[in-house]
A protein has these predicted regions:
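Conserved "HGTGT" condensation-loop signature of ketosynthase/thiolase-family condensing enzymes
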Residues: 1-149
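Short beta->alpha junction loops
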Residues: 151-155
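Short conserved active-site loop signatures built around small residues
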Residues: 159
């Protein structure tokens, strides 16, 4: 068997989802059969036939660096990336930054910012929180990844 030097190795895991705010919490809740689907608390469902959602409840998201400049989805990804880097015991060395890439999967981008802008006519600079590309850009910026930074957007399965 020949050695392939062009490979990707997953060395750390990070997770924030409706049944946990870390890999361990999510795994333990999954083993217990915990469902994250509940009556929504963050979306106004008046006039809607659906009131259930798999919401992520995490009160630590505003601890992200420059959190006020990010949409909620970017904060979730920054938190998961932080856990993955810690799990891998990895800090990006200065001379390796161009070799570290961030590739995210999402199909909507900063939808909370889009909705706030539509409903309230928020500040013009808030449009920078909206694009799908903002998610991977924020993770790369905060952790110093200067390699390829992109987002895969191909329907709801993009994040799986």
């Amino acid at each position: 068997m020949t050695e392939n030097r062009n490979r990707c190795v997953i060395t750390g895991l990070g997770m924030v989802c409706a049944i946990g705010n870390s890999v361990d919490e999510t795994w333990n809740n999954a083993l217990k059969g915990v469902s994250g689907i509940k009556n929504t608390k963050t979306v106004d469902t008046e006039g809607c036939y659906a009131t259930l959602a798999a919401e992520v409840h995490d009160n630590t998201l505003d601890e992200c660096p420059h959190a006020d400049e990010m949409d909620r989805v970017s904060k979730l990804c920054v938190k998961a990336a932080k856990e993955a880097l810690a799990d891998a015991a990895y800090t990006i060395p200065e001379d390796e930054k161009k070799r570290v890439s961030v590739i995210m999967g999402s199909c909507v981008g900063g939808v909370n910012s889009v909705e706030a802008y539509y409903r309230n006519g928020e500040k013009a600079e808030d449009v920078t929180k909206m694009p799908i590309s903002a998610i991977a850009n924020e993770v790369a910026y905060i952790y110093g990844a200067d390699g390829i930074v992109t987002n895969i957007a191909n329907a709801c399965a993009a994040g799986t």
